[in-house]
């Protein structure tokens, strides 16, 4: 599959990588339908994120369709349209339980997706066991309309998927 990959400071490349597969019971494979470049991706490119791993597929802002789920995944099923939380978190540590998932103490907690683990600037993304239970949200038709800019003046769209 085609991916947008961080190679080294100042250098990203379109690269072919194998399609991800389930590795853990809490994994999900999502076919990416829309992805966005974030200023965080640019910070990686410009060398401002020393923990970014060369060779990683960037991107943590995406939507898609669930293709496959591990045996412990209960909140989504294949065929569901989802939006992906930009934060990776365990859901069990002190900070996660208080709602401060960006401070998760797990080694892959905080901002890992597209920085330390392969992200969504690709055809498919594996959302690892380090993606907490609440990280996949249903994407409804109103949200899709807002994302694809098919909304008309006067329409009302959701601004969050909590």
Features from the language model and the residues they span:
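Histidine-centered active-site/metal-ligand motif
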Residues: 43, 60, 162
């Amino acid at each position: 599959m085609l991916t947008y990959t961080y190679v080294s400071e100042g250098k990203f490349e379109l690269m072919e990588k194998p399609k991800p597969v389930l590795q853990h019971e809490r994994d999900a494979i999502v076919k990416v339908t829309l992805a966005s470049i974030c200023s965080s991706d640019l910070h990686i490119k410009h060398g401002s994120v020393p923990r970014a791993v060369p060779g990683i597929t960037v991107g943590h802002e995406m939507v898609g369709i669930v293709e496959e789920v591990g045996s412990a995944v209960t909140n989504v099923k294949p065929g569901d349209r989802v939006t992906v939380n930009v934060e990776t978190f365990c859901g069990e540590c002190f900070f996660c339980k208080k709602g401060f998932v960006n401070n998760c103490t797990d080694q892959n907690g905080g901002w890992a997706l597209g920085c330390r683990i392969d992200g969504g600037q690709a055809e498919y993304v594996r959302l690892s066991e380090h993606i907490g239970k609440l990280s996949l949200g249903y994407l409804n038709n109103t949200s899709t309309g807002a994302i694809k800019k098919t909304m008309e003046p006067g329409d009302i769209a959701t601004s969050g998927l909590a």
